[in-house]
Amino acid sequence: MGVGSSLRMQLTAQKPRVDRFVVPRYSLPEIHRRMTWSDRCEKYNGEIWSSKYLQQKRYINFLDEAFGLAPLKAQQRNSDTFDDWCWPCAPRKKSYLSTADNVLDLPSYSITSFPDVLDWSHDDILVAALGKKYHKWSWRTQSPVDQGQTMFDIRCCKFDPKGKRLLLGTDMRVEVHNELSKCQFVQYCKCNIQICTITAIDWSPTGNSFVTGCSRGRICAMNEKDFPIKSLVLIEGAMLVVKISPNARYVAVAGVHKHRVWILSWPDLIRFRFMKTNEIVKDLNWHPWQTALLGVATLSSDRHASMIIWEPHATDKLRQQDVGRGRYSIDAMRFNNKTGELLLSLWSLDVNVPYPKSSELVVMSNFDTVVDHWGESHTGLNRIRTMVFSPDGTKLATATADEDLIIWNFLPNDYKKILARKKFTAFPQFLDICSYGYTIR
């Protein structure tokens, strides 16, 4: 090859086109590159659990992975100091939520003032309390196994952590029944001569003591060895829910149509902290994996639902998020003990919905991610007032306003043998075991 040919190659070769007025593509920031295609996508302003929204979100995640772009963080609101903070969770990879073709009848449940008359023991026994009677139904044998009776109407019921004893809240008193459905312990509320009703109950994680809340706003810490450990009038009106934390250190309390959540020390019932919201508290639940991580469901005055995640021992660690863009009420919220996922029962408050019965079950892994859902394009499911998980977390029992007890498949069955059951151990639990709930911290 001569000098002339090499010169011609140099003259014909194209130089890289560099324009000092146009920034090369590789130097553009990531957010700018993302906006070139994300702005062209039609924004969906519907519910975050709808199939259209989930399909669009999967498509955006696919584009992020294809172009090697990091997902954008949500816009931080002024009220959200912990915008990236969320509850611990091991979310599912695909949808499992479906009905298990088990529907039982709950007569007179629709007129029950307090809905928590359903529970599931560690022996796979479902109990439903109706009036003065309660009925036990075995999931293993798919048949009723026993029934019991109380002197007064039952307002709430709860199995102890081992599933051997059943705690029943009735008018003026609580009863503890054994495995044979026989009453072995009775304790009256400390409202003296005033007539009240036990509206909320919960066992401590060790099963040595329990807490009760009544219609006059009194909360009592009790055990089966002696009279109530401590009694306290906390609010005016009926108690909605009382929940003892997994480490047996706190008890969370909320009243009916109240705007406050109280955190008391357990079992001495000393006021520790409280959270005041501008919304009505509908339900609350402790996360099973944390020592004290509380989820709170609320309903605003304009009938918009929201949820709050709060660590009571960390005063400033709190995050609130609206649920849905429509008018929904959260009737119940539960954390799954196997995956840590949050399950919400939503009821549409819009009178203009095309279907008269519009209820949603939404499974969330964080504040803006729905991993499973039931309710879209389905009709006929009335308001779900309460729900409870099976001991292994794979099944779900719900009680509706149509007086139906429905069993759901929540997770696939785990057929592997669990050689050692994991337990949450802490010093407060040790003290609670040794002292039968008398420990004063």
UniProtKB/Swiss-Prot annotation:
WD repeat ranges per the UniProt record: 110-148, 149-187, 193-233, 235-276, 277-320, 345-379, 380-420
Major place of residence: cytoplasm
Pfam families (UniProt xref): WD40 (PF00400)
GO biological process entries: anaphase-promoting complex-dependent catabolic process; positive regulation of anaphase-promoting complex-dependent catabolic process
GO cellular component, one term: cytoplasm
Regions crossing the membrane: none
Keywords: Cytoplasm, Repeat, WD repeat
GO terms, molecular function: anaphase-promoting complex binding; ubiquitin ligase activator activity
Protein location: Cytoplasm
Superkingdom of this protein's organism: Eukaryota
Motif placement: D-box: 379-390
Physiological role: Controls wing pigmentation patterning, possibly by regulating scale cell development. Probably acts as an activator of the anaphase promoting complex/cyclosome (APC/C) that promotes the ubiquitin ligase activity and substrate specificity of the APC/C.
Family: Belongs to the WD repeat CORT family.
Name of the protein in question: Protein cortex
